[in-house]
């Protein structure tokens, strides 16, 4: 990937519950492009794993303007295979806690990769 393509990645996307997404939108991360594509996806009780996976795939493979994907850890657990298979540097995928689900470092794929590299 050229350095020019890295420069085009300027957005943070969010996949999470309504409280997490609302907080990130209030912080100024929300964006809707000229095609009506949003850089955020709200998970409700009716959201399927396939819908979460579709949003993740959109942000990590189709969109070339996303630099970081923030995903609630409970949502990452629902699509763990896709999280584990994402190995590109950009967009970076970071698992974050939600209001109702505390962060568990043992489930974090990035932390597991780091521990494997350093031999823990």
From Swiss-Prot:
GO molecular function: ATP hydrolysis activity; proton-transporting ATPase activity, rotational mechanism
Pfam families for this protein: ATP-synt_F
InterPro entries given in the database record: ATPase_V1-cplx_f_g_su (IPR008218), ATPase_V1-cplx_fsu_euk (IPR005772), ATPase_V1_fsu_sf (IPR036906)
Entry keyword set: Hydrogen ion transport, Ion transport, Membrane, Transport, Vacuole
Residue stretches in coiled coil: none
Chief localization: membrane
Subcellular location: Vacuole membrane
This protein's record includes keyword Ubl conjugation: no
NCBIfam families per record: V_ATP_synt_F
Identification of the protein by name: V-type proton ATPase subunit F
Record organism: Schizosaccharomyces pombe (strain 972 / ATCC 24843)
